[in-house]
Amino acid sequence: MTIWVDADACPNVIKEILYRAAERMQMPLVLVANQSLRVPPSRFIRTLRVAAGFDVADNEIVRQCEAGDLVITADIPLAAEAIEKGAAALNPRGERYTPATIRERLTMRDFMDTLRASGIQTGGPDSLSQRDRQAFAAELEKWWLEVQRCRG
């Protein structure tokens, strides 16, 4: 099992949580980005640099992730594809995407894209709060406990 991170858009504070978790869990953590990243020295943490371009990092994560892996992303289509492959998906605010919720999220994303294309200003997400960081850490821990239970 591996934790895959859509690292270009992942907040640094979330990456820090993931670095500590990878060490504690002794779980491979792969940060996929189209730029060089600095990560702490660890046998569990590595970076995968991809070419710049639209969805290049996302496509690489989808190509390499497997059932049982965890994908960290705020990108709804990437989360949907990861779930289709049997991976779990979690956004940096601590929301776990599920097969039941991802369809709704895709519909809302498409609706917001339509609004923006018609010239309506929809605004962006709020900045990451302490509550978001705590929710992320809690949901990551919950996923890890599920993995441990399945392993036996």
UniProtKB/Swiss-Prot annotation:
Pfam families, per the entry: DUF188 (PF02639)
Domain of life per record: Bacteria
Disulfide bridges in this chain: none
Family designation: Belongs to the UPF0178 family.
HAMAP family reported for this sequence: UPF0178
Protein name per Swiss-Prot or TrEMBL: UPF0178 protein YaiI
